[in-house]
Every structure is written in C-alpha cells, then in structure tokens.
Design a protein with these regions (language model features):
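Short glycine-rich substrate-engagement loop in P-loop NTPases that contacts/grips substrate
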Residues: 1-26
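Short, hinge-like loop/turn segments at secondary-structure boundaries
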Residues: 9-10, 78-81, 219-221
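Conserved P-loop NTPase "ATPase switch" module shared by AAA+ and STAND
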Residues: 24-45
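Conserved RecA-like P-loop NTPase ATPase core
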Residues: 33, 45, 64, 96, ...
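Short, glycine/charged-enriched secondary-structure capping and boundary segments
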Residues: 44-47, 76-80, 236
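Interdomain motor-coupling "hinge/lid" segment immediately C-terminal to the ATP-binding subdomain
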Residues: 66-68, 72-169, 173
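Accessory nucleic acid-recognition modules appended to NTPase machines
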Residues: 127-236
Length: 236
C-alpha cells in the first residue's frame, strides 16, 4: 500500500465498480489490508462509501489493519455509524487446545498467542518473542507512531510495572513512587488508558453501585493476556 497516495483507495474502488458493472454482479466485496498505512484513509473510504450509498451500488468493504489505535482513530473521526468493528485478539483456550494441544495450566501461564506456542519449552525464546513481536511492536508502532507522548520511556515503564503487578491492586500514587520522572497521576492514568486501547493492559475499578465510589477506588491492573505478565514474572 502506498502510504502517501490517498487516491490509491479510490482507484481500487473504481476497479471493483468496473468489474461489478461489466459482469452484472449483484454485489462484490472489496478487501484492503493494512489500511492504516495510508494517510487520511478514513476520509477516502467515507467518500467512496457515501458515493456507493447514493448510487445504490452494493459493494461490501472489509478493512483490515494491525494497529488498533490508528484504526479506531480513523473510524471515530470519519466513519461513525458506517461500520461494524470485529476485533481479532489472541486465541481462546479451545483454539489453543485444538491446534497446539495446550493444557489449561499452559494456557493460563503462556496465554493465547499462536505465534509463540511452539516456544513454550524455551522460556528465553518465548519471552523474547512476546517482548519483540507483541510488546515492542504495539508500543512503538501502534501507540508512539500516531500519539504524541511526552515521555515514551515512562509509558514503557508504566506497562512493565503494571504487567508485573497484574491481578493486584496498585494505586497511581504508589506507582508514582516506583517510576522515574513520573510526573503526576493524570499522566499515568492517560498512559494506562492508551495501553488499554492498544490491548495490552487495563485498570479494573472496584465494583460498586455508587459510581463515585467505583471511580475513586484503587484500580486492579490486568494484562489482556497472561503471556505479557510472564515476561516480567518467572514461573513459581
């Protein structure tokens, strides 16, 4: 995909329309992978989609991408109400059991990333894969490429500390004391929100009928996949 050529989307769309018309097809499917690599892709998609809607041209569109943050930004900016979001995250236990013969204990500890399944007998290689292919790729390419971050090192430290304490209550004030150049709790809360949007780590608030008490409670940090915690915590 040409990252700077927005017209490429329109060219693809016109080609599909031409094929549909010349073959008298009732409908067609247009699939574009890694759509987030094109600047202002959502504007181009909105333009072509609205044109098809106006002209009653039945072209179904499937947009794929590897950057959740960048995709959601484009969807929320220009395509609100025009799409259905289907998230493809890590695999379920049944999928890992069927494909890799994972036991429940293995799934709980090693998580559900299929690319790392063959490495579970070598902890060093497994940790290196999760670190480079999942953590580094998400933070460096998903978050930092499209989001202005004043302290990138602090963002990474926040994730590492949160992953280490996954499943435990950890107040933002306590995190401030453990991180270098942490700034304030507002900064940390913003970084945790970014990590949540990218599918790495979230902060779960204590359940309460009272919304004020729930929001004021100390969050329980939780990784989305236990493989992310395993990198920072040895097996015990």
């Amino acid at each position: 995909i040409p990252a700077t050529k927005q017209s490429w989307i329109s060219d693809c769309w016109d080609a599909v329309r031409s094929i549909k018309k010349s073959n008298n097809y009732e409908s067609m499917i247009l699939v574009i992978d890694e759509i987030q690599k094109i600047s202002n892709w959502s504007e181009a998609v909105k333009k072509e989609w609205d044109a098809d809607t106006f002209n009653d041209c039945d072209i179904k569109v499937l947009l794929l991408g590897s950057s959740r943050v960048m995709l959601e930004k484009g969807l929320s900016e220009s395509l609100a109400g025009r799409f259905e979001e289907i998230r493809m995250s890590h695999w379920s236990f049944l999928e890992m059991k069927e494909c890799f013969d994972f036991s429940l204990e293995q799934y709980i500890y090693y998580g559900g990333y299929p690319g790392a399944a063959s490495l579970i007998n070598d902890n060093d290689r497994f940790s290196q894969y999760i670190q480079s292919a999942i953590i580094d790729a998400t933070i460096n390419k998903d978050i930092l490429m499209d989001t202005p971050i004043n302290k990138p090192a602090l963002l990474r430290q926040t994730f590492e500390l949160g992953a280490s304490y996954s499943g435990e209550l950890l107040s933002l004030n306590k995190m401030l004391g453990s991180l270098q150049d942490a700034g304030n709790t507002v900064t940390l809360a913003g970084y945790i929100n970014l990590l949540n949007e990218s599918g790495l780590l979230c902060g779960l608030q204590k359940f309460s009928i009272d919304n004020a008490r729930r929001k004021a409670s100390i969050p329980k940090l939780q990784v989305y996949n236990n493989a992310l915690k395993m990198v920072y915590n040895s097996l015990s």
